[in-house]
Amino acid sequence: MSTTPNIGFISLGCPKNLVDSERILTELRTDGYNIIPSYENADLVIVNTCGFIDSAVQESLEAIGEALEENGKVIVTGCLGAKENQIREVHPKVLEITGPHSYEAVMKHVHKYVPRPERNIYTSLVPAQGVKLTPKHYAYLKISEGCDHRCTFCIIPSMRGDLDSRPIVQVLDEAKRLADSGVKELLIVSQDTSAYALDQSKENQNKTVFWNGVPIKNNLITLCEQLGTLGIWVRLHYVYPYPHVDDLIPLMAQGKILPYLDIPLQHASPKVLKAMKRPGAIDRTLERIKKWREICPELTLRSTFIVGFPGETEEDFQMLLDFLEEAQLDRVGCFKFSPVEGAVATEMADQVSEDVKEERFHRFMQVQQRISAARLQQKVGKTLAVIIDEIDEEGIIGRSMADAPEIDGVVYVDNLSEQEVKVGQVISVSITNADEYDLWGTC
């Protein structure tokens, strides 16, 4: 019988949390622990939680409860871990609780309850890029932690702290390791990607450092330029609409990074945006979108919006629908406002009823589905680069440059056998059909 300790692991939440899970798993593996997908034979279970909205809190609490019931020895980390009292009220038998990105504390607790093995059979087996929970051909790369904004619907800063950017050389080194390991697409994530390095002094931002023998400075534009030298797809997520985002568009037009911008705008009514503490110059946003598309006609714009925010009137909501018609965004996510404990907006007056939220959500989605369908229809007859995600007996599924994994659409590829392509390969596909979300094509 093996004497190697077994650690069960549960990862919940967003891609940023997934990156934290990968970091913890890499350290566990490096220390010689065996990672298993079940509670039954685990010496200890780690639950990496999400606490962004109430439904995520409930999911996390249920996962902790299940781990306690099935195993009994549980360590909790992640965003909900920042609210230790809330967890202990429901689950007092949890061994230890840490907040997000508390890698050293998690490992200290693991060592306390399950001492590291004397003979580490795994060290030589841990890949240079670390343990990854994504398919081998794409990976999330987190460039910073925390956020300096204080949006009234959000509690992320209270859980993850203020902005803390990673050194540019460290980020680029990790990106190169991932590319060298066979990753074909990097998804750049953080709480606020466009704020990268803005937390550092002007002196540090302007200081010249060297990477791969090239002199570089510590800022987002330089980071993207250097990522563009790796010869793989680079996709930006969570880009707050700072003015300097305009400088990214030429890099997309030049093919250095993917022509894809995930930019959460949240609303279009100046009154609602002010209440959210978000940028409110929506006319300026429309002008920027027009300019971006002139510079980079292939640009895909994704955004997210909240309907039913406290104080949102029918007039405010109509402004949002009008904005959708004018902006003609490619991909859109919509969320009904959800009260979150600790968020300023939760205590605001004029809360919108659930019935009205639901009705506005459906009206919003009807408008955007029509827009998305029309924009996808424009791709019929074109030839697109498609990265292959899945190959099975039912067919071949991939994504175009306009599609991020899990949140966007896919491309179904016909008349191609399993023997002709492999997962992670980028192929040219002629688009023959489209609906509101997905494309179909042939090689």
Curated annotation (Swiss-Prot):
Catalytically driven reaction(s): L-aspartate(89)-[ribosomal protein uS12]-hydrogen + (sulfur carrier)-SH + AH2 + 2 S-adenosyl-L-methionine = 3-methylsulfanyl-L-aspartate(89)-[ribosomal protein uS12]-hydrogen + (sulfur carrier)-H + 5'-deoxyadenosine + L-methionine + A + S-adenosyl-L-homocysteine + 2 H(+)
Coiled coil location: none
NCBIfam families referenced in this protein's UniProt entry, alphabetically: 30S ribosomal protein S12 methylthiotransferase RimO, MiaB/RimO family radical SAM methylthiotransferase
Residues reported in the UniProt entry to bind [4Fe-4S] cluster 2: 147, 151, 154
Listed GO MF terms: 4 iron, 4 sulfur cluster binding; aspartic acid methylthiotransferase activity; metal ion binding; protein methylthiotransferase activity
Key words of the record: 4Fe-4S, Cytoplasm, Iron, Iron-sulfur, Metal-binding, S-adenosyl-L-methionine, Transferase
Cofactor annotation remark: Binds 2 [4Fe-4S] clusters. One cluster is coordinated with 3 cysteines and an exchangeable S-adenosyl-L-methionine.
Biological processes per GO annotation: tRNA modification
UniProt: [4Fe-4S] cluster 1 binding residues: 14, 50, 79
Ranges of residues in domain TRAM: 377-443
Domain MTTase N-terminal: 5-115
Name of the protein: Ribosomal protein uS12 methylthiotransferase RimO
EC number(s) given by UniProt: 2.8.4.4
Compartment(s) of residence: Cytoplasm
UniProt domain Radical SAM core: residue ranges: 133-374
Membrane spanning residue stretches: none
Lineage, top ranks: Bacteria, Pseudomonadati, Pseudomonadota, Gammaproteobacteria, Pasteurellales
